[in-house]
Amino acid sequence: MKTSLQIAAEATPRPITQIAEELAIAEQFVEPYGRYRAKINLDLLDASHDRPRGKQILVTAMTPTPLGEGKTATTIGLGMALSRLGKRAICTLRQSSLGPVFGIKGGGSGGGYSQVIPLEDSLMHLTGDIHAVTQAHNQIAAMTDNSWYQKNRLGIDPEQIQIRRVLDVNDRFLRSITIGQGGSQHGIPRQTGFDITAASELMAILALVSGENHADVMRDLRQRIGRMVVAFTRQGQPITADDIQAAGAATVIMRNAIHPTLMQTIENTPVLMHGGPFANIAHGNASVVADQVGLRIADYVVTEAGFAMDMGGEKFFDIKCRAFDAKPAVVVLVATIRALKAHSGRWNIKPGRDLPTDLLQENPDAVYAGGANLQKHIRNAQLFGLPVVVALNSFPDDHPSEIEAVREIAMSAGAFDVAVSKVFSQGGVGGEELAEKVLAAIDQAGQAQFLYELEQPLTAKIATIATKIYGAAEVSYSEAASEQLAKLEANGFGNLPICMAKTHLSISHDPALKGAPTGYSFPIREVRASIGAGFIYPIAGDMMTMPGLSANPAAQQIDIDEHGNTVGLF
């Protein structure tokens, strides 16, 4: 089979103005960035206020291997399959961070015959939103340090400056640094570090702002940025971006980033790409405004939640769905036979290495042995009150006995149905079985619900997630984490939802624990607050907010030829 880049290069994208026209988006709301991408101005929300709302389909997954299990390709393929069945469908996806693109995991634009095109545009910069977030965030960070340096009228405690600088890169050398060296005219030395932009609170804000019209969204953006807690005083009082008078400038930098970007799939199904928060160190979903626009202009919005149901899936309901008045009608859970075998504990799949040859051999017993992971994710999804359709992402090495094992595992856990998805190799036609079963599930959909109430104490909400979703027996806190929780409660932030930062390679905090571990203690080592975004995020285990590069990063294979064509990109 051809590479994803070769397939993308042979595809024929249509002018983005035509894609917009077919969605009945008036020309005045389409702001092209070249021929094949365009910002959709949020004035469209005002103009489409009376349109009936579409239905939302949430795509998530079982716990992935480091290679990923094809969730984005499934999301795109399902959108294309719905279009083939005569439905007006649109996909909403996050914008890819350059960190994973040049790292090991790859981008978030799908692959094979189920991808967003033009591929390079979708992976490299798009319309500049991530750069706007980076600039705005670092502007606030610079003004925080400057406020402390310039007479410190707000009483900033330098040991409690919360905001760290960000870059859209994987770079472990920036995790812990000293700034302000070289004498007093260059600042005052202090320890800090960088996070990846996808972990920035401003990225989470961009993905969570909402409103009934353009003005509402802009107002919400300005207010959320103003509420960002950048530091504390020695007395424990929060200091915000408004306090240091940085919120206005940051909002101006991001004023164009609030508009979602319209792209298309390889079969010309429309895609809205907007927002890029990671799901392991942020809430991991495409923006609320992309969904709002999609629900106004399409009958079905297929959206993706990052990593697995315990990660982006849970956060989709308990964080994103609280930000606007819409909930999905069905959950699609992506599974692969290789991931099920990996969760048997018999193989150790590592990024950058070929799959063990014996893992590809027919072995339904290994599939059953890893089935607890898939079943746990199905039951987790059911906690939110919706039917679950399992999409088995098919690979050439899958065997009929293994496929039947997946069906038995899923149905015994209460899945609505199981569909074999071949969208990677066949495009939309390979997703028609999945689309038909999703539509059948929507006809019987229940009412989506939250996992916990916001009024519960922070520790109770954390315990609910850890025990009900992760299978832990208890939660343990470091001394620092306990103090941080107490300070947040004392400052009136106890009614915010929880955004757990943990590994995506296990339902637990420990990437070595496969399957569906139970009976363990879930450790919280640190608790941070994203008050502007509107959540508290505890950090479990050794979770890093700035990734590092592997020994053989993907960037080493990427180059350009004499005609300006990208080579080596997937």
From Swiss-Prot:
<dbReference type="InterPro" id="IPR027417">
    <property type="entry name" value="P-loop_NTPase"/>
</dbReference>
<dbReference type="GO" id="GO:0035999">
    <property type="term" value="P:tetrahydrofolate interconversion"/>
</dbReference>
<dbReference type="InterPro" id="IPR000559">
    <property type="entry name" value="Formate_THF_ligase"/>
</dbReference>
<comment type="similarity">
    <text>Belongs to the formate--tetrahydrofolate ligase family.</text>
</comment>
<keyword id="KW-0554">One-carbon metabolism</keyword>
<keyword id="KW-0067">ATP-binding</keyword>
<dbReference type="InterPro" id="IPR020628">
    <property type="entry name" value="Formate_THF_ligase_CS"/>
</dbReference>
<dbReference type="Pfam" id="PF01268">
    <property type="entry name" value="FTHFS"/>
</dbReference>
<keyword id="KW-0436">Ligase</keyword>
<protein>
    <recommendedName>
        <fullName>Formate--tetrahydrofolate ligase</fullName>
        <ecNumber>6.3.4.3</ecNumber>
    </recommendedName>
</protein>
<comment type="pathway">
    <text>One-carbon metabolism; tetrahydrofolate interconversion.</text>
</comment>
<feature type="binding site">
    <location>
        <begin position="65"/>
        <end position="72"/>
    </location>
    <ligand>
        <name>ATP</name>
    </ligand>
</feature>
<dbReference type="GO" id="GO:0005524">
    <property type="term" value="F:ATP binding"/>
</dbReference>
<dbReference type="GO" id="GO:0004329">
    <property type="term" value="F:formate-tetrahydrofolate ligase activity"/>
</dbReference>
<keyword id="KW-0547">Nucleotide-binding</keyword>
